[in-house]
Design a protein with these regions (language model features):
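Glycine-rich phosphate-binding active-site loops on the catalytic face of alpha/beta enzymes
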Residues: 1-13, 72, 85-106, 154
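Conserved anion-binding
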Residues: 1-66
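Generic hydrophobic/packing signal
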Residues: 23, 69, 82, 87, ...
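Generic preference for flexible, low-structure residues
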Residues: 15-18, 29-32, 36, 83-85, ...
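Extended, intrinsically disordered, low-complexity segments
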Residues: 28-47, 113-154
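C-terminal helical cap(s) of enzyme catalytic domains, especially alpha/beta-barrels
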Residues: 11-26, 98-121, 133-137
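Active-site/ligand-binding-proximal alpha/beta "capping" segment
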Residues: 41-96, 148
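Contiguous hydrophobic segments
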Residues: 12-21, 61, 68, 72-82, ...
């Protein structure tokens, strides 16, 4: 299992969206060379993963593991959008649980995540929450330490 890296506590899903789009673009590149074993071997070495993993990713046109999005998800529309980009699920936190309408908002996110491919249900889920009660969150530009900057750099 992996997760995309959004910025938790911000209510800004843009970082999670950016990461899943980057991941999808990289998978498309691998998919485009799926018939060239030498290129797949080169990519496997470059990424420091097994040839079998690169080959399977190319064949599936997705990572061969579950991919969850996290960070900044605070509305049903956020969750549905990430699912439509290819995520297998979403993790929610303070964007939901610190909102004034947390129970209603959590139910709406579950509904939108389950039926992300049905716009009518996603719209109904979005109508279940009052955006005036959304957690305003933090400005990602002013964070001292961003999630994507933690840990050792590779």
């Amino acid at each position: 299992m992996i997760r995309t890296k959004g910025e938790p506590g911000t209510g800004d899903v843009a970082e999670a969206v950016s990461h899943i789009k980057f991941l999808n673009n990289e998978i498309r590149k691998v998919r485009s060379i799926c018939d060239d074993n030498q290129e797949l071997i080169r990519v496997a070495r470059e990424l420091k993963v097994s040839f079998a993993t690169v080959e399977e990713t190319a064949r599936l046109n997705r990572l061969p593991v579950v991919n969850f999005a996290a960070g900044g998800i605070s509305t049903p529309a956020d969750a549905a959008f990430l699912m439509s980009l290819g995520c297998d699920g979403v993790f929610v936190g303070s964007g939901i649980f610190k909102a004034d309408d947390s129970a209603q908002r959590a139910s709406a996110v579950v509904l939108a995540t389950t039926y992300f491919d049905n716009p009518k249900i996603v719209l109904e889920a979005q109508k279940m929450v009052d955006e005036k009660k959304s957690m305003l969150g933090l400005d990602t530009k002013n964070l001292e330490l961003r999630m994507q900057e933690r840990g050792p750099s590779t």
